[in-house]
Amino acid sequence: MRTHGLRLVLLALLPTMALGLLEGLYCGKENCYDVLGVTRESSKSEIGKAYRQLARRYHPDLHRGAEAKAAAETQFKLVATAYEILRDEESRTDYDYMLDNPDAYYAHYYRYYRRRVAPKVDVRVVIVVVLTIVSVIQYYSGWQRYDSAIKYFATVPKYRNQALEIARDEIQEKIQKKGKNRMSKNDQRDELERIIRRVIEEKMDVKGGYAKPTLWDVLWVQLIICPYTILSFIVWHAQWFWRYTVMKQPYGREQKLYLIRRHLGMGQHQFEAQEDKLIEEYLHLKLWKRENFVAWKAEQEEEMKKKLAENPRYKAYRRYMKNHGPGRITFED
């Protein structure tokens, strides 16, 4: 009995399945081309013209009576659905594929709902929004790092005293004045901190990752000037090769610092954050020469070993490793 019922259902669906028409997909059991009265060879303009004519004919407001309005509304929705499918090239291609391949039952459902569920936002818009958000966060984070660096320098006695010495006249004029215009203690403290911060910002050359951020550092600008950056990189290396490899010209200060930084394996910001005294020591030792750098590095490693050997905590660690060996993880643990 069940087998007989299943056969009846299949026989009922056979005409539409043979035509490639599936209930719930596109125009349902109707052919979208027939709904608009066009053919598969019709152009976009012909499809649009047919839609406008049928939309005026079946618009519910042009019909009177409940039954007439209901029938017109149903047909109007079908016409609108057919037009939405056929006016878009991608959905029209999928619909034609369904008509040409009625046996690919599951593929039709996948293509249809993939297009329905897929986001309609342009990928280019998403990329622009993401780049903008990253650039804003990058710029804001740069200001936070710079602000924390200035606050730190304002607490260091060396830089704080220098700022007080530079702003001595301004402090006497604004803070240490007497009479009716004399500031309260809280106002004096706030004004003093403001003056110290301003002097440090003006005089202190903060470098490295805590440097004062500029718009040139954000991702958006870097992407825009990327072709220029690549070209400059190629030209710089070509000039370096010609001047110092082919022509054997002597190195200048900037070239020496570049070689030292490369030997140390530091980035530009990290190297610029080094103290001036330490950088001058690198230059004095001529560390831009590979053989000098190798010898200096060996000496540094040897000194580090001596310091560790004299360190009580390191001695205790070595005794522990000698007696117990490295720790092991077992299944019993």
UniProtKB/Swiss-Prot annotation:
PROSITE patterns the UniProt entry points to: DNAJ_1, DNAJ_2
Organism: Drosophila melanogaster (Fruit fly)
Family, as annotated: Belongs to the DNAJC25 family.
GO cellular component annotations of the record: endomembrane system; endoplasmic reticulum membrane
The entry's keywords: Chaperone, Coiled coil, Membrane, Transmembrane, Transmembrane helix
Chain segments annotated as transmembrane: 8-28, 123-143, 218-238
Subcellular location: Membrane
Protein known as: DnaJ homolog subfamily C member 25 homolog
Highest taxon, organism lineage: Eukaryota
SUPFAM superfamilies the UniProt entry points to: Chaperone J-domain
Annotated Pfam families: DnaJ (PF00226)
